[in-house]
UniProtKB/Swiss-Prot annotation:
The keyword ATP-binding applies. This is Nucleoside triphosphatase I. It is found in: Virion. GO terms for cellular component: virion component. ATP binds at residues 55-62. It comes from Yaba monkey tumor virus (strain VR587) (YMTV). It catalyses: a ribonucleoside 5'-triphosphate + H2O = a ribonucleoside 5'-diphosphate + phosphate + H(+). The gene is NPH1. One of its GO terms (biological process) is DNA-templated transcription.
Length: 631
């Protein structure tokens, strides 16, 4: 059926061929060809009521969307635009972009924050005010967050956001309304999110049942066929977050390092107490205490089972004050800082006060100490991701920065009033080399919707629960032309996963989370492939054998067909001669995959999916007594 989808895409492009490629407002911008393509297809089909912009961070999803909103009047005169976004993203990028390039539509825009606890009430209140003569265009930014808030809880209770989800799913397709969903990571935590977002875009075409059997999609072909044209797919980095990616004229090179640091004896003691406390309290699966202890350990671990929350808060506050008082007004000597900046450590001839201070700081946090040393040795600006803010998180990290004489700004929930200005100062061209502000430390609040320029090193101090969040974090620094002002020899980003290690060799919470991420990624990769091959770009490029059409009367029927996941696609089993191999996409072998190489040089993964042909002169390395091909 993809040929039929291609015919409708071609019809839309012809219908909108006179659409300008420039967007004029108080400023002027020329769209990239891929942005213009999306706009022409979406606006060229009146009955194409929804689309997912599955675009990498930094390729211009916001610009594409604002261009579409600007030209809604080309197909109908009266529109109400509902922008459902996180509060942190209203001003920048949305308000700023609209006011710069399409100020005339601002009077038609209603912003509603879906991270507001009263979101659903505000949504339905605004819906009631919309004139019956007006069509509605909904923009759902970072739609994976909205989907996550719409999932039914494990106890079976429906979240308030689900009522908004149900309304959009039912009503957007009526009266030629439109909806644009934006995300660089449309599936984050669970494969159920795939079904949720598909049914939001194409109501009720997938039933809530398992799409996988033994971690393999039951019917990939059926999904691709029925979901044709559901999204626009612009993903330049299809590699795992743990793999290296070569740079290009527009994007910086990415190099990944698994950087292991050994806990001190004191930190190990607190870490083991945290582990026991998790087991006793029944929250071991969340690993909160261990994650905090692996990052920073106070001199004692509060017994949280015998105390109230207020008592625990007071005790942690006292421990924090004790630590601050201890290091207050302490800092390393100029000679020590010079050594650290040159990438060297202290020696026996160094100032005893410097040696003692470094030892004390490392006793409490092997991670914070190591990151500070690497920041000072970095030639450019740095980002540090730390999800925790109070107790053992950003609050303490900033104390370490002070001792190491590191200048920084913070982007987190506690800096809401200043964080946009902080990032603006950090991104200034005059600060390209980090001479005024060396580091921006950010929590999960900084994982979406903001951009950083001329970053050379990213340090991830604590893992998220999924690869998608990690991609969002790294994607803040590797964006289209993000390193344009950086000297050519520094157009790279080193990504360091800082992993705490126990002397016993027992896996730590950091290593546990990495394994969880890798397990989830296998299923997500297959679903992303479905999005790719059902995208308007893939169809138009690969499906040339179609009959031109003169109207769009059949589009709604074509895109309303129900997916039958119970019918398994036929698999052709073929025998091939060859050998089992190990391969990696990274020369540092961050992730190693098991595969099969045929006698004629074709490489397949363990599920029989073709990867690529073996290079003529392959690079082979040895890792844990395995011969590993670097491809």
């Amino acid at each position: 059926m993809s040929r039929q989808h291609a015919a409708y895409i071609d019809y839309a492009l012809n219908r909108m061929k006179k659409m300008p490629i420039e967007m004029l407002g108080s400023d002027t911008i020329t769209l990239k060809p891929y942005q213009h393509f999306v706009a022409k297809v979406f606006l060229g089909l009146d009955t194409m009521h929804s689309i997912l912009l599955f675009h990498d961070t930094g390729v211009g999803k916001t610009i594409t969307t604002v261009f579409i909103l600007k030209h809604l009047k080309d197909i109908y005169t009266n529109w109400t635009i509902l922008l459902l976004v996180k509060k942190a993203l209203v001003e920048d990028p949305w308000m700023n972009t609209i006011l710069k390039y399409s100020p005339e539509i601002i009077k038609n825009c209603i912003f509603i924050n879906y991270d507001d606890k009263n979101f659903h009430n505000k949504f339905f209140t605004n819906i009631k005010t919309i004139s019956s003569r007006s069509r509605v265009c909904v923009v759902l930014d970072e739609c994976h967050n909205f989907i996550s808030k719409s999932l039914i809880k494990e106890d079976g209770k429906q979240r308030p956001t689900k009522s908004v989800y149900n309304y959009l799913s039912k009503n957007i397709s009526l009266n030629n309304n439109k909806m644009i969903c934006l995300s660089a990571t449309p599936i984050v935590n669970n494969v159920r999110e795939f079904t949720m977002i598909v049914n939001l875009l194409r109501p009720k075409i997938i039933q809530f049942q398992s799409l996988f059997e033994n971690k393999n999609l039951v019917n990939e072909k059926e999904l691709i066929d029925k979901l044709g044209g559901i999204c626009s797919y612009i993903v330049n980095d299809e590699f795992s977050i743990f793999d290296d990616v070569e740079g290009s004229q527009s994007f910086a090179k990415k190099t990944v390092y698994m950087h292991y640091v050994n806990m001190t004896k004191q930190q190990e003691i607190i870490y083991q107490k945290a582990k026991i406390a998790e087991i006793k309290s029944g929250i071991a699966s969340f690993r909160i205490y261990r994650r905090m202890a692996a990052t920073f350990s106070f001199d004692s671990f509060p017994d949280k089972k015998k105390k109230t929350i207020d008592e625990i808060t007071l005790e942690l506050g006292a421990l924090y004050k004790d630590f601050v008082n201890y290091v207050n007004k302490k800092s390393f000597s100029n000679n020590a800082i010079k050594l650290f900046k040159s990438g060297k450590g202290l020696t026996g001839d160094s100032n005893p006060l410097d040696i003692s201070l470094l030892s004390e700081l490392r006793q409490k946090s092997c991670k914070f100490t190591e990151v500070c040393l690497k920041i000072l040795a970095s030639p450019g600006k740095c980002l540090v991701f730390e999800p925790f803010i109070n107790q053992s998180g950003i609050e303490v990290l900033l104390v370490y920065f002070s001792v190491f004489c590191i200048t920084s700004v913070e982007f987190s929930s506690r800096t809401k009033d200043t964080r946009i200005k902080n990032v603006f100062e950090f991104n200034k061209e005059s600060n390209t080399n980090g001479e005024q502000i060396k580091v921006c430390v950010f929590s999960i609040s900084g994982g979406e919707g903001i951009s950083f320029f001329s970053i050379n090193d990213i340090f991830i101090l604590d893992m998220t629960w999924n690869e998608a969040s990690l991609k969002q974090i790294v994607g803040r620094a590797i964006r289209l032309n993000s390193h344009a002002n950086t000297p050519p020899n520094r157009r790279y980003v080193n990504v360091y996963f800082i992993i705490a290690r126990l002397s016993s060799g027992e896996p730590t919470v950091d290593e546990d989370l990495i394994n969880i991420i890798k397990t989830k990624s296998k299923e997500f990769f297959q679903l992303f492939k479905v999005f790719k091959e059902s995208s308007i770009e893939w169809i138009y490029k690969n499906k040339k054998d179609f009959y031109p059409i003169n109207d769009e009367s059949g589009w709604r029927a074509l895109t309303s067909r129900v997916v039958d996941v119970n019918v398994k696609s036929k698999r052709t089993v073929q025998l091939a001669q060859g050998q089992n191999i190990w391969f990696s996409n990274s020369s540092r072998m961050v992730t190693i995959h098991k595969g099969f190489k045929t006698s004629d040089g074709k490489i397949f993964d363990v599920d029989g999916n073709f990867i690529q042909n073996m290079p003529i002169n392959p690079i082979i390395k040895i890792h844990n007594d395995k011969l590993v091909y670097i491809i």
